[in-house]
Amino acid sequence: MAVIFVMATTVAASAQDEPEYKLEIGAGTGLVSYVGDYNSNLLKGMKPWLVLMGKYRMDPRTALSLNIGTGKIKTKEFNHRITEADLRLEYNFWAYGTGNEYRGAKRFTPFITAGLGATFYGGPEKGATMNLPIGAGVKYKIGNRLNLTAEWAMRFTMSDKLDGSKDPLGIKSSGLFKNTDCYSALQIGLTYDLWEKCKTCYQE
């Protein structure tokens, strides 16, 4: 019994000593597709997508995520590159972590994300527009400092020129997103934890 007690005490102490981290940095890849005047199918014309990401963990359930992505959107009518930068809020349905640094945290959790960004597009009507990314995904902590994520997010833009043409079909509509182009990205990413949290900074 004494041996079991000593082992349990040692495991508990090592769990409490496991560091927490505030920051994640990493990269991902996936597929991007355009929805607009020349395409209404999310799964049609998907092209390679690359993304760099950084996340600041505010607590085990929420994080701020900065993303920079690039890829091509293409149909038979056009072939343009888009590059985006956005800032999002991520909300985890369950507290996220190894369960050692934060009691009750889980290695796996689904999450939702939304934010605000900018999209830069090429072509004859090249320019920039705001985008509103909204999506969902899952994340899994595959190691003490390694995180695997999979997510899908739709970007609602305020431009009808991502495809190089403004309202070529003469569609009548009104409102903030009047006949604007959108695009979505399905991606997987790998991030690494940095910036160890000080556990004694607020202790007397």
Regions found by a protein language model. Give the residues of each.
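Residues on the lipid-exposed face of transmembrane beta-strands in outer-membrane beta-barrel proteins
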Residues: 27-31, 52-56, 87-91, 114-118, ...
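Short glycine/proline- and aromatic-enriched beta-strand/turn motifs that initiate or cap beta-hairpins
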Residues: 15-57, 191-197
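Residues that define the transmembrane beta-barrel architecture of outer-membrane proteins
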Residues: 21, 44-48, 81-85, 106-108, ...
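Outer-membrane beta-barrel strand-turn architecture
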Residues: 19, 56-60, 93-95, 120, ...
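Gram-negative (and chloroplast) outer-membrane scaffold detector with strong preference
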Residues: 60-126, 192
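Outer-membrane beta-barrel translocator domains and adjoining extracellular loop/strand segments
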Residues: 37-42, 75-79, 101-103, 123-128, ...
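Predominantly the C-terminal beta-signal and adjacent terminal strand-loop region
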Residues: 73, 82, 142-204
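Glycine- and aromatic-enriched membrane insertion/assembly motifs of diderm outer-membrane
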Residues: 40-92, 155, 168-173, 187
